[in-house]
Amino acid sequence: MIRGGGSPSPYPSVPNPSAGLKRQCAVGAPRKSVMSQTGRDDPQSLDSQLCFAVYAAAHAFGRAYRSLLAHHELTYPQYLVLLVLWEEEGLSVKEIGSRLFLDSGTLTPLLKRLEASGHVRRARDRPDERQVSIFLTDKGRGLKGKMDCLPHTVGGMTGMTLDERRALLDNLASMRDELHARAGSTELPAANASR
């Protein structure tokens, strides 16, 4: 179900996602499709893929932020780390990774670059010396005020109103949570594994 007053999903809610996918993807099974409502009748076309639309939009956001962040010599992933730390300092690498959906192999180099540029510092936790906590430096804290306009600026580039952006954010968060909850238990039939 789409939040924010949108239309209900044309796909049935199925307690066992695997059974639902097999039933929906069965040869000759009629199914109501979002694609046919928008003129995209081929469910295997790239333009009909919700996953690709989200992927492409994420890349477009990255490009939009890249030019704005270049003035501060930051990358978009580094900016995301700073957003987390502006909310709460002293988090472990694992806690930051959990919030950003990044593994330590991806996050550790980002933190090293932020540390080398003077935006963050690492500190060993006194009770457990193996645990490293990440804190902002004065330079890192000072960037927050300089970047307050970024979300509004990039949001304005979308061509959507603030209310539309908030509704989309709610829908995407709901979709993300559902996918995380179901991803491990879904078994796709080999012939229809495109989504």
Curated annotation (Swiss-Prot):
Superkingdom of source: Bacteria
| GO annotation, cellular component aspect | cytoplasm
GO biological process entries:
response to stress
Recorded GO molecular functions are:
DNA binding; DNA-binding transcription factor activity
Task: Establish whether keyword Hydrolase is in the entry.
Answer: no
Give the DNA-binding residues.
93-116
The record's listing under InterPro entries reads:
HTH_MarR-typ (IPR000835), MarR/SlyA-like (IPR039422), Transc_reg_Sar_Rot_HTH (IPR055166), WH-like_DNA-bd_sf (IPR036388), WH_DNA-bd_sf (IPR036390)
Does the keyword section mention DNA-binding? yes
**Could you share any additional remarks the record makes about this protein?**
Can modulate formaldehyde resistance independently of the formaldehyde-sensing protein EfgA.
Name of the protein in question: HTH-type transcriptional regulator TtmR
Annotated organism of origin: Methylorubrum extorquens (strain PA1) (Methylobacterium extorquens)
Designated gene of the protein:
ttmR
